[in-house]
Amino acid sequence: MHCSTWDYAKHLELASAVAERFKPMIFLHSSMQSDYSGSFSFLCFDAYESSSNSFHELNEQLNASKASDSDFFGLLSYELKHELEQLEKSSKGRIQLPKLLMHRYNIVMRFDHQLKTCTVFHRSVDDLNKIPKPNTSGPLQCTLAKLESNMTKSEYLQKVRDILEAIHRGDLYQANLT
């Protein structure tokens, strides 16, 4: 991997321009809202390798890696737990995601929000030409999607009561009701 410096100033606008041009892409934005969220954001695009089946496949790709390869970025779903332990299968949610979806990218940009710097990790010098110009014609316009729950208020409250009872019984110590 090569390493270059880049303009930090318009990182949100740059992420928007990348999203319009590259699929898949990942933007991990710390937004510096609190001490524990870290000081770095990452923008990754121009994928050259993917893994989407299992830990086994990902492990094989990692073992075949060269020092010049970038890291994998992506998602690990809760369903991957079945590759590690014999657990009861949960009901399918409304959003169908792969168990694992990881990509290696030709371009990984790291924004340091404390130092106000941007470091670009890229596989070739030509990759720098792929970085789009950020949209600077005006303020970045963001829209929110319509959010709705998959349960009624009474269903939610009943599930909270069920979780609290399980905690009091000692069946679990923590829950994330989503």
Residue ranges and their predicted role:
Residues M1-T178:
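Signature of the chorismate-utilizing enzyme
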